């Protein structure tokens, strides 16, 4: 009986895969995410994961936002602040990664 083998590989590209703004999140959602009293939450996923550190730096320099979560292994970044600040930070971070590092970009989405 032959065994079937599956090999999974992580092949990092240079990509912003998600840039989403949650305006006026409900209290329960904000609490579960760990950013109570946030006017808005920005969520990004990036490849390679280490890009989250660069994205966090760009976001903090772009607007008056705070980092709620950053994981350099999974490439996740959560920022929070006012709606205008989070929107500006996400926009500047996405465009900065494209301009400075030639990343493949996604459209910023909102809810």
Curated annotation (Swiss-Prot):
InterPro entries, A to Z: BMC_CP, BMC_dom, CcmK-like_sf, EutS/PduU/CutR
Record carries keyword Heme: no
An example Gene Ontology biological process: protein hexamerization
Keyword vocabulary terms for this entry: Bacterial microcompartment
Alphabetized Gene3D superfamilies for the sequence: 3.30.70.1710
First and last residue of the signal peptide: none
Subcellular location field: Bacterial microcompartment
CDD domains reported for this sequence: BMC_PduU-EutS
Residues annotated as transmembrane: none
Annotated GO CC locations: ethanolamine degradation polyhedral organelle
SMART domains: BMC
Family matches, as Pfam families: BMC
GO molecular function, one term: identical protein binding
Pathway: Amine and polyamine degradation; ethanolamine degradation
Subunit relationships: Homohexamer with a central pore; the hexamer is not symmetric, it is bent by about 40 degrees; bending depends on Gly-39. Interacts with the N-terminus of EutC and of EutE, targeting them to the interior of the BMC.
Similarity-based family: Belongs to the EutS/PduU family.
Protein task: A component of the bacterial microcompartment (BMC) shell dedicated to ethanolamine degradation. Its unusual hexameric shape may help form the BMC shell. Targets at least 2 proteins (EutC and EutE) to the interior of the BMC. Proteins such as EutS containing circularly permuted BMC domains may play a key role in conferring heterogeneity and flexibility in this BMC.
NCBIfam families attached to this UniProt entry: PRK15468.1
Protein name: Bacterial microcompartment shell protein EutS
Lineage, broadest ranks: Bacteria, Pseudomonadati, Pseudomonadota, Gammaproteobacteria, Enterobacterales
Gene for this chain: eutS
């Amino acid at each position: 009986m032959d065994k079937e083998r599956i090999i999974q590989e992580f092949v990092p590209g240079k990509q912003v895969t998600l840039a989403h703004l949650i305006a006026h999140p409900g209290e329960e959602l904000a609490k579960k995410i760990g950013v109570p009293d946030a006017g808005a939450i920005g969520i990004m996923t990036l490849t390679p994961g280490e890009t989250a550190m660069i994205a966090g730096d760009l976001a903090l320099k772009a607007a008056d936002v705070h980092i709620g979560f950053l994981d350099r292994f999974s490439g996740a970044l959560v920022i929070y602040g006012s709606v205008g600040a989070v929107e500006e930070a996400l926009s500047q971070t996405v465009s900065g990664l494209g301009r400075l590092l030639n990343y493949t970009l996604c459209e910023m989405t909102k809810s």
